[in-house]
Amino acid sequence: MKHNLTIDIETFSDISIGKAGLYKYAQSPAFQVMLFAYSLDGAPVQVVDLMVPGAYLPQEVLRWLFDPDCVKHAYNAAFEWYCLSRYFKLSEDEHHNGFSAATWLQQWQCSMLHGMYAGYPAGLDATGKALGLPQDQQKMSIGRSLVRYFCTPCTPT
């Protein structure tokens, strides 16, 4: 039976993703995965704060993350896939124990692309509004400010 693992991560880098792009952003030595949210087969969402000393992903999550029979879902899956490939130090070409970032990519599905195929806009905020989701289920309006505050370097004052 195929399983579905839905993933959302929050990350930090000292490189601006908007100016330099995803690859340079995630290749920075300062790059970190800070939060890892997941739901397996529609179960309630769990969040792991990887910034807490000694925090780690549960073994069950790691098992599903690397199980080829488990489909990984994310909104803008290319971001999650590449950032997690860097986090787990997966090579893009070389196989490590029969596994590489390239083979892992085939296990991912992008809910943003699925939505765009169905005629919805690409932005999470716009998609929530277009779907008519209740306000408490849409992207938080303060979300962009929080990401900017926690996920990018601060200018010294």
What are the language-model segments listed below?
Residues 1-31:
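Entry/capping segment at the start of metal-dependent catalytic domains
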Residues 31-33, 38, 42-60, 64-157:
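Active-site-proximal helix-loop-helix substrate-binding element of RNase H-like nuclease domains
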